[in-house]
Amino acid sequence: MLLLLTLVSILVSPFLANAGTPTAPVGGALEREATEAFNHAEYDQVLKLWYSLPSEATASKPLIRLAFQSTLRLGRPEEALTLYQRLIPTDQPDDPALLRPLALSFLTSHVSDREEYVRITAYTILAELGLPETQAVLEDGLLDTSVLVRTRAADAIGKAGLAGKSGPLRRALNDAMPAVRIAAMKALSEAKVIDIMPYLIEVGRTDDGPESVFAYAALYRLGKQDMLTDITGAATLPDPDVRMAALGVLGQLKRPSSLSVLSQGIYDPEPSVRAFAAGALGDYGQASGVGPLTHALGDDSARVRAVAATSLGRLGIHDNHPLLRALTRDADMQVRASAVEGLLRLGDTSAIVLAAELAKHPNPSIRAAAAHALAATSDKHAVEILQTLLQDQQPQPRLFAVKALGKSGAPVTPLLKKILQDTDVAIRLAAAGSLLQQLRHPTTAPKAR
């Protein structure tokens, strides 16, 4: 009997000992199999191996990394985010080499989404970023059924510096919709693609709408300086759409001779044209625009007053401070938000208090306007307000808060990573875009005051 008990003790003790020790990391066999599958581009097989792991198993970092890379290749960024969190715990510094492709995957995986608004959002953000490595995705966008997607794709190709070598962008000059053709003209002319000049001359000769103005502008960029006369003349034509196009172009070209025409636009009978003129004076960027913008602050149209306030802030002239401070008491809340933005652009962080009040307004569009205004500063109190708006019940304030954080010089990456899990897909895409903005200049962003 004693001998039997001794034998049982010897046999059982190893199992008892093993039960008390942590589960060992998964052995090399599974890792080698996953590596081989990955090297053969069998990404589904890699994930099949990954998900076959028992829940109690401790996976090795190389295996997690293989699964992470496979989810990116398959366009499944939500799964990749979970794996990233396993690779880089929240108490460790982020790895840009992993976080950047993860953020980009959120955008590229939605460019073919069934919902048009999602595709528009993805391409709009890609246009803001201008990433050369997305050329294939951007050129695919030129074939989308949505006019806005095609337009944003053309813009993005130009911003990415790809216009000069993009055959699909040249073909977009023949698109059925003017907005796409205009975007293609702008991108190609900025890339100094000279051989489109005959096309541009023909458009300028035959079109009597806004498209002709953009053709003139493209010709001007390509060296035909006399086109400035045609653009200036278009700013006084009967069609308000043509006048707006001309004023917008003149503001961007920033020619000293254009000031009188831009100033005259502030007195246009159409409020939409006056607003365009106010915005163009902000683009023009010269102190000589203060006079007409000051007049615009008294306009009957709240939209005109709001754009004028933003433009005054963009000029960066501190003498405009009293004008903007007075506008924070405007009857229209959107105008107040624009005045706050203008003050913040002038470095007046006391305006953050006013932004905080607007961020509590019952109208979600006003809360969104407050978030937009706060993009003009990296002050820590501004970040706190934006962080609160990230919890808003309505998507619009959350969306603008996420975009504002992308422009912040404060350390906001942890906040943006959290928003990658938002319930609204458009906000997740905006968070990805803001993360890419943050990763672009991690060391040169201004410090929070």
Q: How does the language model describe each region?
A:
Residues 2-14:
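Bacterial N-terminal signal peptides
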Residues 12-102, 446-449:
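N-terminal leader/linker segments that initiate helical-solenoid repeat arrays
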Residues 70, 94-98, 125-128, 156, ...:
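Core register positions within helices of long alpha-helical scaffolds
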Residues 47-48, 61-65, 77-82, 97-111, ...:
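Amphipathic alpha-helical scaffolding segments comprising HEAT/armadillo-like alpha-solenoid repeats
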Residues 114-115, 145-146, 176-177, 207-208, ...:
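Short inter-helical turns and helix N-cap capping residues of alpha-solenoid HEAT/ARM repeat scaffolds
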